[in-house]
Amino acid sequence: MEEVEAANKAAVESCHGVLNLLSQQTNDSKSIMVETREAVCKFKRVSSLLSRGLGQRKIKKLNNNNYKFSSSLLPQHMFLESPVCSNNAISGCIPILAPKPLQIVPAGPPPLMLFNQNMCLDKSFLELKPPSSRAVDPKPYQFIHTHQQGVYSRSKSGLNLKFDGSIGASCYSPSISNGSRSFVSSLSMDGSVTDYDRNSFHLIGLPQGSDHISQHSRRTSCSGSLKCGSKSKCHCSKKRKLRVKRSIKVPAISNKIADIPPDEYSWRKYGQKPIKGSPHPRGYYKCSSVRGCPARKHVERCVEETSMLIVTYEGEHNHSRILSSQSAHT
C-alpha cells in the first residue's frame, strides 16, 4: 500500500509539472511532450500496482485501456489554438501555442451509456433504450387467459363424479353445486374426464382396455346387500363384506391374561396384539366348536377398570349353540 501511495504521489507531481508548463507562455513543445509522457508512465505504474493480483486477463484489459487513453489524452488541437500554416505547407511552419484556461468540472454521476440502434443485436430481441410507457404485448397473456376461460367456463355449476365401469352398471354421481369453478365436471373410472359439453380427455398413466372394464364391471355388479347379481361365483372381496360386531363388558376371572370368562361356544386363541396406551395386550380367538366357523372375538382389559374385560364379537356362527363348561385355550 505504501508503494502505491508513493507512485501515486509521484504521478500527481508530474502532472502538476505538465500543468505549470502549459500555463507558461513558452514555445517549448518538446519539453511539454516529455513531461506528459513521463506523467502518463507514472500513472501507468499506479494502475499496474492497483491491478496486481486481479489476473492476467484483467491486467491486459487495463493496459489496453490505458494505452488508448494515453494516445488520446493530449491531442494536437489542445495545444494549437489556430495553426498558422496550411495543410500543404505543414512541414515548414512553426506552430504557435496559445494557452487555454483550465476548467474544473464538478463531480457528478457517471454519464449514462448511450447505445445506438446499430449496436443492438436485434430490435425485437435486445434493445437498450429507456423504458417506455407502452405496455408489453399482451398476446401471450391473452392466449393463456382465454384458454383458462375456455376450461373453467364449462363447469360453473359444480363437480360431478361418476363411477361407472360399463353401460348398464350402477353408477355413483354426487354433484356439488357450491358455485365454485372447477375444470372437472365428470370423473369416470375408465380413466377419462368428461365435462358438460361432452368433450373428454384421458388421464395419463391409468390402465385402459376391455379387460380392465370387464373386471371392473364384474366387481361393481355386487350390490350392497352382500348378494352377487350374477349366478356364477361371487368375485367380491371378503374384506369388503361387513361383519357384525358387538361388544360387551364382563368381569375378569383373574389377573392372568389367558383367563377369560366362558360362554356357550368353545374358543381357541390364535394371536395377541399390544394396545397403545394400555399395558395389557388384546387376545384374538376363533370359534373351535365347529371347524370352519367364521365367528371371531377379541378380548382386552379395560383401561379405566382393570377388573373388567371388553369382549368384542365379530361375525356370526354357522352352527347352533353348543354349551360347554369351559373354553379351550392354547
Swiss-Prot record:
It is found in: Nucleus. The keyword Protease does not apply. GO terms for cellular component: nucleus. Gene3D superfamilies: WRKY domain. It comes from the Eukaryota. The keyword Cell wall biogenesis/degradation does not apply. This is Probable WRKY transcription factor 74. The gene is WRKY74.
